[in-house]
UniProtKB/Swiss-Prot annotation:
Keywords: Actin-binding, Cell cycle, Cell division, Cytoplasm, Cytoskeleton, Nucleus. One of its GO terms (molecular function) is actin filament binding. Controls reversibly actin polymerization and depolymerization in a pH-sensitive manner. It has the ability to bind G- and F-actin in a 1:1 ratio of cofilin to actin. Binding to F-actin is regulated by tropomyosin. It is the major component of intranuclear and cytoplasmic actin rods. Required for accumulation of actin at the cell division site via depolymerizing actin at the cell ends. In association with myosin II has a role in the assembly of the contractile ring via severing actin filaments. Involved in the maintenance of the contractile ring once formed. It holds the Pfam family Cofilin_ADF. It is found in: Cytoplasm; Cytoplasm, Cytoskeleton; Nucleus matrix. Its main location: cytoplasm. CDD domains: ADF_cofilin_like. This is Cofilin. The gene is COF1. The keyword Cell division applies. It comes from the Eukaryota. The keyword Cell cycle applies. It comes from Yarrowia lipolytica (strain CLIB 122 / E 150) (Yeast). Belongs to the actin-binding proteins ADF family.
């Protein structure tokens, strides 16, 4: 079913569409750097991926604290880190699929089947992280993933 808020190209196999404001928020993060993270959720009607929260914190721990312990979310974080070779700081956009073990099975299923439509719509993501518990999205784990080959960029 076509929804006037969303473009057909951002419809997932599950029938969940990416709301245009979700894409606009990402483009503002990517281009304007006004926010450092966006947390997305599937709305209660299970028809759209929408922005749940945007933040400007410099603290990765604050961002992690926004992820619910018992439900799924998508997120984008502007991950800034130091290059170990002394070349200074780098920043990479990281896409998170947060699907904790304690989330309801139905929620996990709809988030899994809707992820690709959002992920394809967000151009400029350098790293993708799947998290089922907080250890998988810990700063050190993400740093290891984003810094692979950082000296060659």
């Amino acid at each position: 079913m076509f929804q006037p808020c969303c473009s057909k190209s951002t419809m997932s196999r599950s029938g969940v569409a990416v709301n245009d404001s979700a894409l606009q928020a990402f483009n503002e993060l990517k281009l304007g750097k006004k926010v450092t993270f966006i947390i997305y959720k599937i709305n209660d009607a299970k028809t759209e991926i929408v922005v749940e929260e945007e933040g400007t914190t410099d603290s990765y721990d604050t961002f992690l604290g926004k992820l619910p312990e018992n439900d799924c979310r998508y997120a984008v974080y502007d991950f800034e880190y130091e290059i170990s070779s002394g070349e200074g700081k780098r920043s990479k956009l990281v896409f998170f699929t947060w699907s904790p073990d304690t989330a309801p099975v139905r929620s996990k299923m709809i988030y899994a089947s809707s992820k690709d439509s959002l992920r394809r719509a967000l151009t400029g993501i350098s790293t993708e992280i799947q998290g089922t518990d907080f250890s998988e999205v810990a700063y050190e784990s993400v740093l290891e993933r984003v810094s692979r080959g950082a000296g060659s960029h």
